C-alpha cells in the first residue's frame, strides 16, 4: 500500500510595526502583505484536518534575532498536530528551547549551512525525526553547479540561499541535501524562490532532483495554486508531503476539499 501523502499549511511570521507577531504572504520572498494572526490560523488548520503545521519566523536569521518563542508557545497551545518551527535556529540550545516551547520538529536553513555540524548535534540529542533541513533554492543558469536539470530547454542548477533568500551560498541544493541526510536530517523541506507565491505550481525539476538523489522524505513547498498542483508534485516528483500557504489562508481551497480532490485523483491521503 502506498504511503499516505501529507498536506501541510504553513505560516510565514514576522513582527509588525508594533512588534507583534503577524502572518504575511508574498511573491518570490518579497512584497509581503499582512495575512492574519498566527494563533488564529493555527487553530483554524488544526480543526480543518491538516496533517501537520509549519511556523516559519521569516526574518529571525536575517536580523540575527532569536525565534519568537512566546508566539510559538501560543501556537502550540492551539495545535494538536505535528508542529514544525523554523527561523533563527543556530545552536543545539536553540533547538532545545524551540522544542520546549511546543514544537515537535525544528526547521533549520541558515544555521545548518553556516555550521553543518549542527545537524548531527541536533539529531544525536533529540532524534533525527526532530531535525528538518530547509533549503531556499534559486535557479542558476551558469556553470558553477554540480547537478543540472533541463528547464524550458535550458540547463540549470539550484543554489542554496540563506537569510530568507537574501544571500547566495554557491552550494548546490542536491549536494547539500545529500550531505544533510548523511549528517542525520530526518526530513528535507524544499522551497523554491522562483515559484514562491506565483500559484503556478511547484518547481517540479527542483523537487524531483532532490527526491531522485536523496532517500530522506521531502516536503515540497512554494508555488501551489490548486490541488492539481499537489497531485503533480506527488506524481511527477515523488514528494512525500506538499506545503501550501496562500490557497488556504485566503480560503481559495479548504483542507478538506483539497484532500478529497487528491483522493479522487488516486493520491493516498488521510481523509
Swiss-Prot record:
Heterodimer of HisH and HisF. IGPS catalyzes the conversion of PRFAR and glutamine to IGP, AICAR and glutamate. The HisF subunit catalyzes the cyclization activity that produces IGP and AICAR from PRFAR using the ammonia provided by the HisH subunit. SUPFAM superfamilies: Ribulose-phoshate binding barrel (SSF51366). It is an enzyme of class 4 (lyase). The keyword NADP does not apply. It holds the Pfam family His_biosynth. It comes from the Archaea. The active site is at residues 12, 136. Its main location: cytoplasm. Keywords: Amino-acid biosynthesis, Cytoplasm, Histidine biosynthesis, Lyase. It catalyses: 5-[(5-phospho-1-deoxy-D-ribulos-1-ylimino)methylamino]-1-(5-phospho-beta-D-ribosyl)imidazole-4-carboxamide + L-glutamine = D-erythro-1-(imidazol-4-yl)glycerol 3-phosphate + 5-amino-1-(5-phospho-beta-D-ribosyl)imidazole-4-carboxamide + L-glutamate + H(+). Its EC number is 4.3.2.10. GO terms for biological process: L-histidine biosynthetic process. Pathway: Amino-acid biosynthesis; L-histidine biosynthesis; L-histidine from 5-phospho-alpha-D-ribose 1-diphosphate: step 5/9. The keyword Transcription regulation does not apply. GO terms for cellular component: cytoplasm. It is found in: Cytoplasm. This is Imidazole glycerol phosphate synthase subunit HisF. GO terms for molecular function: imidazoleglycerol-phosphate synthase activity; lyase activity. InterPro entries: Aldolase_TIM, His_biosynth, HisF, IGPS_HisA/HisF, RibuloseP-bd_barrel.
Amino acid at each position: 500500500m502506498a504511503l499516505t501523502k501529507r498536506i501541510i499549511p504553513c505560516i510565514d511570521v514576522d513582527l509588525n510595526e508594533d512588534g507583534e507577531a503577524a502572518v504575511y504572504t508574498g511573491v518570490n520572498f518579497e512584497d509581503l502583505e499582512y495575512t492574519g494572526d498566527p494563533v488564529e490560523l493555527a487553530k483554524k488548520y488544526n480543526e480543518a484536518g491538516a496533517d501537520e503545521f509549519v511556523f516559519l519566523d521569516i526574518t529571525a536569521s536575517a536580523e540575527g534575532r532569536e525565534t519568537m518563542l512566546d508566539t510559538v508557545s501560543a501556537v502550540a497551545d492551539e495545535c494538536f498536530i505535528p508542529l514544525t518551527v523554523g527561523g533563527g535556529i543556530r545552536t543545539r540550545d536553540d533547538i532545545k528551547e524551540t522544542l520546549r516551547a511546543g514544537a515537535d520538529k525544528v526547521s533549520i536553513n541558515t544555521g545548518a549551512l553556516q555550521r553543518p555540524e549542527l545537524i548531527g548535534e541536533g539529531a544525536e540529542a533529540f532524534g533525527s525525526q526532530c531535525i528538518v533541513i530547509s533549503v531556499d533554492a534559486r535557479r542558476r543558469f551558469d556553470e558553477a553547479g554540480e547537478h543540472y536539470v533541463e528547464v524550458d530547454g535550458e540547463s540549470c542548477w539550484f543554489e542554496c540561499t540563506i537569510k530568507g533568500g537574501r544571500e547566495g551560498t554557491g552550494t548546490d541544493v542536491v549536494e547539500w541535501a545529500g550531505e544533510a541526510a548523511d549528517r542525520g536530517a530526518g526530513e528535507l523541506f524544499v522551497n523554491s524562490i522562483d515559484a514562491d507565491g506565483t500559484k503556478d505550481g511547484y518547481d517540479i525539476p527542483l523537487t524531483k532532483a532532490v527526491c531522485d538523489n536523496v532517500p530522506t522524505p521531502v516536503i515540497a513547498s512554494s508555488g501551489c495554486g490548486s490541488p492539481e498542483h499537489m497531485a503533480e508534485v506527488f506524481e511527477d516528483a515523488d514528494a512525500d508531503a506538499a506545503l501550501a500557504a496562500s490557497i488556504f489562508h485566503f480560503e481559495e481551497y479548504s483542507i478538506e476539499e483539497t484532500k478529497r480532490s487528491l483522493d479522487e485523483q488516486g493520491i493516498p491521503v488521510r481523509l
